[in-house]
Structures are given as C-alpha cells and as structure tokens.
C-alpha cells in the first residue's frame, strides 16, 4: 500500500464534507486537475452541494452524488458548459477513497462526483481523478454505501450532504456567485421513498387462521368501499329508524331546452303552462337556432370569399411588381443604347487632332468590321479557323518556293511577308580534335595510357630512375 502513496503526487487543497454519515475530509490534486478542483471548490463555496443526496450506490464500486435535482441527470459546472477531462499518469483507480468526476461521456464533466469503494481499473482514462479521502473519515465514506437500494441502484433512504467547508483553497481568485436556490416542489418527506411493507406471517400465531380470515375480510371491505362516499343508509342497512324510501322523487317530464337565469323563480309557474304555449316556445327556439346556423354558414362563406379576394389581390400585386421590374430593365437598356449611340456619333463628328489618332481609329474600325464578319462559336467557327490555317500554310510554301536558296533578300521592317522566305543559319563553332603529337592551339590534350608514345615515355622514365639508384 505504501508504494501507492509514493506514486501519487502531493495534494494541494482540502475540503470538508459534512454528511449524514459523518464528516469526510477530501484532499485535492489542484496541480494535476486544476479545472476539476476549481469547479469543486467554487461549488462548495457557493453551497451548491448543500442538502444534495447521494443518488446512486453500487456496493463495492462507487457512491455518486453532487446532483441538486437528485435524478442523476442534472447539475452544471461553474464554466457554464461541460469541461474537458484531465488525466494524469500517476493518478489511477487502484484503491478505495478516490474522488473523481462523474460524466456521461468524454469531456462531459459537470457538478456530479463519486467516491470509489474499491479498485476500479475499468474507469482509468475515462473519469478525472481530482481528490482522495484521508484519515479515519474513509470509514464515514464507506457508511454511505450501507443502504438498501432498488434495481436502478437508487437507495431507498439516501444519505445527503448537509454542508461543505473549504479548509484550504489553492485558488485565491475564486469569487463565489449568487445562486438562486430552486424551491422544492415537494417536501423532503414526500421525496423519500418509503420502505417496503413487510408481509404478515400468520402461521406463527396460535389463532393464525382466524386472523388471516379477518384480514382478508377487512381488505375486501376496504377495496369495495374505496373511493366512494358512504351515507348512513349504506353503512346501517338494518337500522329500523332509517327509511328506505327517498324523500324527494324526481319529476319525470320533458324539461325546456333553454333555461334563463331566473330558473328558480319561474319553476313554480312551469306547471301551469299549457301544451300550446310549450309548442310555440319550441318553434321560436327552433327558428332562432336556424337563424344562428344560417348566419354561421353565411359568415363562413364570407370568410372564404375574403380569403379568395385576398389571394387574388396578392397575385395582382406580384404581377404589378414583375411588370414594374421589366419596365425598369427595358428603360435602363434603352438609356444605355442611347448613350452608346451618342458616344459613337461624337467620335465620328470629332475632328482628329493628328494623323496618329486618325490612323488608330481607322485600324480600330477595320478590326471591328472583321470581328463582326466572324461567325459565332460552333462548327462554322471551327471550319473558318481551319480554312485560315490552310491558307497560311499555302502562302508559306509558295513564298519558300518562289525565293531561291542563294538569293535570299534581306528582311525589312515594313515587309510583313519577308520573314516567310528567310532561312535561319547558324555559325559553326565546333572545335576539331587532332592528333596528340601535333601542337596546335585548337587541339585538346588527350592522355591515353595505351598510346605507344605514352608507353615509351613511361619505360624511359623507369630506366632513368634505375640508373639514379645504382649511382647512389
């Protein structure tokens, strides 16, 4: 166990949780997990965890809390959004008493946290470890798991955090926020689930059969009387002082269809109304109903007519807008054409200031006329291009054939066709390789060891060297 403590980095920060199971001291790794520690300390300073329950208990694994709603799906961080995970190579889920952030996925940390009750290697690199339980308070932490739980890992009587106290805050710049505490819709007694009722074992009693029969009869009577208000007639059927005849009999007869506000006052006079008067009243009511229905039908028809008229008016407005746009476009086009024509006229009417401008304008008109003669893109345009190419080829071959090779005229700047008959000639600057024995400025020095001259020279030099050695 000591090697585990040696591997873990030193802590920097301490918080005390006061729970219904006892006090729990938590030391924080604020350098290794700064975001998680800052979030936890600030929520403790803001009393965010006060009166929150430990809503999830997995025996031998974890105890989870920190959700103000108590459902396991609530809680927010101080950053206003889930913050990222912070993993460290020296912090592993290898023992009990570690405090880590609970999340629903990667980088989804909020306010919920959990204590480990044992080794949990499957949680490594999935949850951020930011603290550990120290001292004897680890036994109070273990008491949090000693509760009855249901199939959803929710305790029947969960422990809760009464208050939090920050003993050492490594973050001096934390400013607690003012959080409005939500009012609980139900009192705490109603939120807590009741313990399951025990079943009665009548076989242990000497009068068990009689007690069981009485219990069944009571249950049957309570089920039959459940949800119904009973009078003394229902409960005391054998009482001779109670009459079984109702006090007031309901009068059978046709009641009028419409009743006015003064119904109670006119009830006494209804008995004296003759049959003819009743028939007249019914006819009046029927006529009135017919008028109402016809008025409703008429109003519905008028509404449909109004809708049709509105839709027709909208269509007319759209058509008017479209026509207006077309007129504006035509007008703008007309103005542009008029401006172009005026510009052309002004160019024609203006006298050329000098010969160069006049020549430029003539050339421009010439090429514009040629451009107008050109056909549009397509097969005809391609045919025209091929015809021009063939014409140029024939012209080039004709110019070469007419000009003899010896009599090549010099090209002139103004002659556009002189270059067609010109022949390109280059100066021969190649150097000749001659014999190595001949000394010439234009020859290259070539050394070939197989050359007989070079062989003789080598033999003579060897002979001279031998003679020198002998003389010594």
Swiss-Prot record:
Residues 231-241, 269-286, 304-347, 359-371, 425-437, 457-472 have a biased composition (Basic and acidic residues). The modification Phosphoserine is found at residue 346. Residues 206-230, 306-377 form a coiled coil. Glycans are attached at residues 109, 201. The modification N-acetylserine is found at residue 2. It is found in: Nucleus. Signal peptide: none annotated. Residues 257-268, 404-418 have a biased composition (Acidic residues). GO terms for cellular component: catalytic step 2 spliceosome; nucleoplasm; U2-type precatalytic spliceosome. Gene3D superfamilies: Cyclophilin-like (2.40.100.10). Keywords: Acetylation, Coiled coil, Disease variant, Dwarfism, Glycoprotein, Intellectual disability, Nucleus, Phosphoprotein, Retinitis pigmentosa. Transmembrane segments: none annotated. Pfam families: Pro_isomerase. Residues 206-386, 398-472 are annotated as: Disordered. GO terms for biological process: mRNA splicing, via spliceosome; protein folding. Disulfide bonds: none annotated. Residues 11-166 form the PPIase cyclophilin-type domain. It is linked to Retinitis pigmentosa with or without skeletal anomalies: An autosomal recessive disease characterized by retinal degeneration, brachydactyly, short stature, craniofacial dysmorphism, and neurologic defects. Retinal defects are consistent with retinitis pigmentosa in most patients. Neurologic manifestations include mild-to-moderate intellectual disability and psychomotor retardation. Belongs to the cyclophilin-type PPIase family. Part of the activated spliceosome B/catalytic step 1 spliceosome, one of the forms of the spliceosome which has a well-formed active site but still cannot catalyze the branching reaction and is composed at least of 52 proteins, the U2, U5 and U6 snRNAs and the pre-mRNA. Recruited during early steps of activated spliceosome B maturation, it is probably one of the first proteins released from this complex as he matures to the spliceosome C complex. Component of the minor spliceosome, which splices U12-type introns. As part of the spliceosome, plays a role in pre-mRNA splicing. Probable inactive PPIase with no peptidyl-prolyl cis-trans isomerase activity. As a component of the minor spliceosome, involved in the splicing of U12-type introns in pre-mRNAs. PANTHER family: PEPTIDYL-PROLYL CIS-TRANS ISOMERASE-RELATED, SPLICEOSOME-ASSOCIATED PROTEIN CWC27 HOMOLOG. This is Spliceosome-associated protein CWC27 homolog.
